[in-house]
């Protein structure tokens, strides 16, 4: 019975993903072959609430973080805090003439974030919290912070994917932070939801 209910919920999410709406783009220069990533929203996402889809890197053809509408600001705040820590560590490295380091940061990113990915079909992982510790790396002039998460499908435990997002500059952080503006992105989604609610 529980499995049937879960399948029905995921089917609703799948319909929503297929009806995703483009909101805008953020830039990230970690992969020189692709520097522009989509930010979209769906009206029936996590917990059947409007959710934001942030395109990221991963092993599947399409890879997304999913943030429900109530967590947009907390996700933005998390990336802001991570940016400040990135700036701080770069300063420490420069002051101490450190040119090579690979270190796990004791600074977990908090916020309930799910994942969606697609190869031949869509898969979803909603039962985890994006709370793993990031890695900070310096090698020569390259300075990066990487979040990576192995995710497993809610509907099939044998379907897994690795998704990740890497920041190589303050500009990478700022581009994502700026588009995750609850006052604009959240207001846009709530406006669409409000219009839908008048037709009952």
Which residues does each PLM region occupy?
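Sec-dependent N-terminal signal peptides
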Residues: 1-17
């Amino acid at each position: 019975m529980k499995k049937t209910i879960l399948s029905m919920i995921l089917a609703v999410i799948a319909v929503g993903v297929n009806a995703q709406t483009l909101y805008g783009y953020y830039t990230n220069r970690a992969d020189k072959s692709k520097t522009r990533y989509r930010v979209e929203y769906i009206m029936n996402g996590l917990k059947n609430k409007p959710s934001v889809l942030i395109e990221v890197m991963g092993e599947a053809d399409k890879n997304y973080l999913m943030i429900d509408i109530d967590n947009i600001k907390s996700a933005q705040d998390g990336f802001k805090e991570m940016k400040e820590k990135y700036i701080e560590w770069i300063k420490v490295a420069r002051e101490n003439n450190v040119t090579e380091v690979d270190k796990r940061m004791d600074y977990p990113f908090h916020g309930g974030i799910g994942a969606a990915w697609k190869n031949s079909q869509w898969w979803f992982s909603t039962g985890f919290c994006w709370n793993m510790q990031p890695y900070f790396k310096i090698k020569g002039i390259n300075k990066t912070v990487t979040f990576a998460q192995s995710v497993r499908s809610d509907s099939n435990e044998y379907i897994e994917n690795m998704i990740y997002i890497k920041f190589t500059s303050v500009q990478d952080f700022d581009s994502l932070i700026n588009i995750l503006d609850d006052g604009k992105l959240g207001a846009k989604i709530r406006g669409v939801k409000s219009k839908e609610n008048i037709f009952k």
